[in-house]
Amino acid sequence: MKVLALWQGMGGVEYHRLYTPLKRLQIDHAEEIEVNVSQDFQKAGLPELKQYDLVLFNRDLGENHYEILHYLAKHEIPYIVDIDDYWVLPKFHPVYKYYREHKLKQRIIDAIRYADGVTTTTDFLANEIRQYNQNVQVLPNALDLTDEQWLLEPQQRDVITFGWVGGITHSNDIMLISDAIAQMCDYYGDKVRFVLCGYQPGSMWESILYKFNGCAEKLRSQVVVAPSQNVNEYGNFYRLFDVALAPLENTKWNNCKSELKIIEAAAYGLPVIASEVAPYLSINPGVKFTVNTPEAWFAAMRQMYEQADLKIVGENNQKHTNKIHDLTTINQKRLAFFKQLCK
């Protein structure tokens, strides 16, 4: 089976939903699948698509979106679109205006509607997709734990450290824990630390840092900023702390996301404090769930701080997550789905 994956650039989506699983498929099932990649596909290359049994992409194909879809349909070349996010963006999203101007919502819906199959991350998002296409395969996110970024030694620390890893789309989520961080810093003084991971210069990140800093103008001594890293290196962040924070507003946009932060924390055997909202609702003995109030977040952080067996809680997350998000097992389902569409 000869497969072509199309993507533009290498962001987190491409890395987790296409590059990582397809790399392992090629390594583990070389006798059954040949994976080719194009990161800058042009319409001049349309005739070359005939040599492939299956074409894969995530969400959208760029400026040649409809021409490529039309060519695939005309020549009966099956394709799978992978959907990892809800296609209706909240108005505060940084690319909301761009989505509207370029009609990306409709382009994504059409990609789903005409696809031979759709892959996605969760049952919640799969139910949204089924409005347009019934042939949906849930393939949860999973890490390739043989990658170096998930195998590094933890940083030596002398105080309990909480950390958050994320991007500029999570500004509202960070606000949920702002007061709790301020209370923790006041309560424990220099015996606690918070690490903000992924920082880049710019007004949106400055807003996130302000909130993460407990809305204090001067950077607190307990708050550390770790600059952005590449997608094949950012796993290093999880070496820097003892407890991962996963605050999330209860919105449909967020409900359609995956539990990737819990999966990443599990790679380093870390416990997690997460908002009690989808997609974080699955029972996990290594995750402390909390409602989204400052008092509840402060209480959850204090409870985790005082936890005598913190390492055991983290190991529970690791064991639980490794069973559900095992890349080898998920890739067997992925390969079977590919074969089904190539008959």
Briefly describe each language-model feature range.
Residues 4, 154-182, 195:
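Conserved donor-binding/catalytic core segment of Leloir-type glycosyltransferases
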Residues 71-74, 99-117:
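Membrane-proximal helix-turn-helix segments that form the acceptor-binding/catalytic region
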Residues 124, 142:
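Carbohydrate-associated surface elements
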Residues 143-159, 343:
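Acidic anion/phosphate-binding donor-loop and adjacent secondary structure
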Residues 172, 228-237, 242-264, 274-282:
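Nucleotide-sugar-dependent
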Residues 198-200, 206-240:
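Nucleotide-activated donor-binding/catalytic signature segment of Leloir-type glycosyltransferases, i.e.
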Residues 285-295, 302-308:
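Conserved acidic donor-binding segment of nucleotide-sugar-dependent glycosyltransferases
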Residues 308-339:
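A charged, aromatic-enriched C-terminal amphipathic alpha-helix characteristic of glycosyltransferases
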